[in-house]
Amino acid sequence: MNAYNLQKIGITERGDAGIDLSWSSKMNSVAFAIIITKSVNDKFIKELLKHKGKVILHATVTGYGGTVLEPNVHDYKWSHAQVLKLIEAGFEPAHIVLRVDPVIATTKGNAVVDNVLGLFEDTGVNYPRLKSQASKAKFTRFR
């Protein structure tokens, strides 16, 4: 790796890094990477652990997985179990951002966010990121 590559940052912005693992073969050409997925599956965990210390994981979790809103996404309890599996295998919780998406500005939507955040409290993940479908001003309680 040359000096230029030591300054390069990778990010998986297209597709889902938990499904398309092609990012793994490019890790030697970057200093570190931000890996984004809705699917922290077992194959993904295996690949991610090869690069631990060199990646920040953005684990997108929805409280609507398996519903009409997110029919092809795992529910948040599955995601929680998989994130715990990743941490128990040696991945640092400090290198994980919990992305709660979508946040719907309704009483039920707030309850969904509370359920997701509450379940993930035992993981040691301290960086939640909420993607609101409404103005940020309506979510002052999350600041």
Q: Where on the chain are the PLM-derived regions?
A:
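Conserved AdoMet/S-adenosylmethionine-binding subsite of the radical SAM
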Residues: 2-143
